């Protein structure tokens, strides 16, 4: 019995590496998944917008921020000076101007009945950018992660 616990722990750790909680859906590129999660040109109702994201992940995402701008404008931030990301990588870029955004926070419910509150904001943002994958728009770099809101 004592041997079983370490073995179970090892299996769980390895499973987490294979199937991370925030895995990108297989048929999407990192940039497309970023667009689905974080780009909405106009203000939105959080319950409706988050249901689209939660349907991919099959759980209630605790928090999410939607930038009210175009993918093209957010991708243009990737052309600005690189800065250090929260994870220590150097592929982040900060917007020069604040944008309107909506912060959605889980207030109650279990998937698929997730309920969110909404907070309108006007702030700067930092995105992580990578070279595009084959089916991404043909920019030099594309946003793949919303690293921070300032």
Curated annotation (Swiss-Prot):
Residue positions the entry lists as glycosylated: 55, 100
Subcellular localization, as worded in the UniProt entry: Secreted; Lysosome; Cytoplasmic granule
Gene Ontology biological process terms from the UniProt entry: antibacterial humoral response; antimicrobial humoral immune response mediated by antimicrobial peptide; defense response to Gram-negative bacterium; defense response to Gram-positive bacterium; innate immune response
Give the UniProt keywords, A-Z. Antibiotic, Antimicrobial, Disulfide bond, Endonuclease, Glycoprotein, Hydrolase, Lysosome, Nuclease, Secreted, Signal
Q: Which InterPro entries match?
A: RNaseA, RNaseA-like_dom_sf, RNaseA_AS, RNaseA_domain
Protein task: Ribonuclease which shows a preference for the pyrimidines uridine and cytosine. Has potent antibacterial activity against a range of Gram-positive and Gram-negative bacteria, including P.aeruginosa, A.baumanii, M.luteus, S.aureus, E.faecalis, E.faecium, S.saprophyticus and E.coli. Causes loss of bacterial membrane integrity, and also promotes agglutination of Gram-negative bacteria. Probably contributes to urinary tract sterility. Bactericidal activity is independent of RNase activity.
Q: What is this protein called?
A: Ribonuclease K6
For this protein's source organism, the top of the classification is: Eukaryota, Metazoa, Chordata, Craniata, Vertebrata
